[in-house]
Amino acid sequence: MIEWNIKSTTRAQQGLYEYDAVSRLRDSQLGEERVHDVANYIRKGKLWQAFEADKKVVLLIDEVDKADIEFPNDLLQELDKMEFHVYETGETVRAINRPIVIITSN
């Protein structure tokens, strides 16, 4: 099971991935080699982890009511199509095995 515990500051994008532009800028200023591959600065979210799992997993999105009112709507397309686009790399992430998604609310 993959658990995604929602807080009042959680954004839907965090469940997909986060791009660390600040670290990439710092590395470019330091002349780091890793700066040439943008994938080094992508942190996979819980939805991405569930989509790329080798076997069927359960994704628990816990206490969705704590987030902004638009939070559930922001994930509808990704959960319906079981895929999303990573703009920084041009990659489309598709579910290998469709996860079982459980969403809880208080």
Residues of each region from the PLM?
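AAA+ P-loop NTPase catalytic core and its hallmark functional loops
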Residues: 1-106
